Amino acid sequence: MSITVVKRDGTREPYDANRINLAIEDATQGLDENIGWVTQIASELEITLFDGITTQQLDEAVIQVALQNVKDDPAFDTVAARLLLKTIYKRVLGDYSSPEELKRLHAEHFARNIQRGVDEMLLDSRLVQLFDLERLAQALEPAHDELLKYIGVVTLNNRYGIKGRNGDALEVPQYFWMRIAMGLTLNEQDPTSTAIAFYEKMSKLEYLAAGSTLVNAGTIYPQLANCFVMEMQDDIEHIAKTTRDVMWLTKGTGGIGLSVSKLRAQGSPIRSNNTTSTGPIPFMHTIDSVLRAVSRGGKKFGALCFYMENWHLDFPEFLDLRQNSGDPYRRTRTANTAVWISDEFMKRVQNDEDWYLFDPLEVSDLNELYGKAFSERYAFYVGEAEAGRIRMFKRIKAREQFKSILISLQTTSHPWLTWKDTINNRALNNNTGTIHLSNLCTEITLPQDEDNVSVCNLASINLSQHFADGKIDFAKIEQSARLAVRQLDNLIDITRSSVKEADFSNQQNRAVGLGVMGFTDVVEKLGFSYESEESYDLIDEIMEHVSYAAIDESADLAQERGAYPNFAGSRWSEGLVPLDSIALMEADRGVPVKVNRTTRLDWDALRTKVKGGMRNATLMAIAPTASIGLVAGTTPGLDPQFSQIFSRSTSSGKFLEVNRNLVKDLQELGIWETVRENILRSQGDIQGIAAIPDHVKATYRTSFQLSPYAFLEVAARAQKWIDQAISRNMYLETRDLGDMMDIYFAGWERGVKTTYYLHMKPRHTAEQSTVKVDKSQDADGTKRKGFGGFGGGAPAVAPASAPASTATADAPAPQAAPAPRKGFGFGGVGGAR
């Protein structure tokens, strides 16, 4: 049967197999098996063809054939990415026959596409007015697209790329990177040169701006900030205003943290009309509905996290917000929840004491206090309650509430646990008020009040692109950190929101959050285990260099552009740096913080320098990087590998993920072809496959196979250098509440500020319908049980009696695993069954 292909203009032409084969051959250039793969893809493609197939369907069919072979060799992903890139090039630039012609087309069309974006009122007219477009066009390098994986190309094109008013794509990837660079240099004296410098870094995936910046930079709606943190006040006008603000910030793609701790409890009196309050829950449900009504950038639902202090009288209902059962009008289906926990509560859990819940109307100052001041005032209110001088309160056991929090965490992954006293005591910008909450992803820690909606602007260094010749390039990391801080500082003067309190706070504090991603990627390339001392020292050293360079650059920018307005009176002005905050927290808490204090760089010189001024109130925060990590083609944030082979579902579709580092190591050992089917059969788990050496198994333990104390130790080592916080996902195999209590207590003891999602290992797995397996074969190996140490080996961190490695390590290093506390008596008690 003859097959005809329908072209874009509606005409038909005979299917040309040779033309398709040449396209496939071009996409396999430089790959080891390119000749065999051309034949394989072409033969598998023939099965999918039909008469009348469109050119778009044909392009998609070739890509899908390549993708279905990724499980056999991750290099097929490169083939798929190249094929997709070619379709994007053709639609935006037209046909081409060589890399040289492609580069020429990039340069020829660039100014024309920028002008079209301006004419269609999509792009800022200053992109034409302020820049030497010809010079920028000559700087474009389409070869950088080779760094993108297939999922990165799809994510960049579908989620972040600019579309014309008629829906057609305006940007190829290199136009996208240059548009971002231009949009972040509008305030530079030499915008063209600086844009090229930013472009070089981002197009090489060395660092990436966060999502809102990628969507809106260079456009007529420059809402570039990523995180907004606000507090709802206890009056009807401010509740209504907060709802309005959430709508506008959501429209602009911002993620939101919102504290409801000040709202009076259900049943609390309202004097203006002689009735009683419904409490915060109905207002939270209303805002939850707003998140669905106003999409972020027209692409997905709004995103928000509610925060509540756990002394609030309505906290038990807050715990139920994410439950599937119950009154739907007292549930939040879209918004997340997090609990704001004090040291006082943790100590009462530890000592098995009572915990009192109050109506904020009667204890209105508690919300503004932290540390010792909070504990003293809380004890005063406890006495008042017992004396009958407080109208509404409830007494429970602290351990029972902690148990309830963890059970809710098991069943719904909410509320996330965040520690308010750790956050406030470690803040270097503490002169501008109390920090009442974190943000959507728990990495931002900024003060806020009725007149200030805190704003943070994010970027992340891709560690994978700072690894070469078997080692980390620390000089390159420092260079990236400096340029990223300058870029983020520019962003603050360019971004605009529709909330005046946010714009005011942004200018007064100039907060930025530079983080990292790809940590697990480089750990694997180095052959380390995630739960090893080498891994802990690595993140320690990386973050020390990032921190030093970022702080030093901000001090330089202060000399060039002036210090941020609220600098005077901050701990920066006293010459303190993030490392110094550990001692401040320790002094307030009254117990040692179990974190290593090793240093490598000349911090005394930097302490002296920061006294002279800082351009930014904050500089560092490690975001989850779930989306930009896909573009960067690396592991997100500090997270371990979820699995060696798994299907990832995103807003752009489903994608098969195969760990290229593992495949490369197994290919070098000559056993990939032998063990491939066993890995597929075990759903990416290599621990029970006898043919794989133990050292490889140690390197490639996945999230549920690692000790959760390793996640905490990595976070604690990174946190000592970070002035804000870390989105620290947790992965647990156990459902034992005793284990869970011990784990989260260990996080608090190590000075970790926040945790993020809790992922529980599924009890059951689905049958693999696409994998042929011999079920008579039993994989060797035994499953590790319990949490007695890191991977069942010797403790990875020196015991408390061991000397610190430097003179600055004046506190004992943490033990690899906690004392056998077993959850204060909850050991063996299951949560959600």
What are these regions (language model features)?
Residues 1-833:
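Extended catalytic cores of very large enzyme megasubunits
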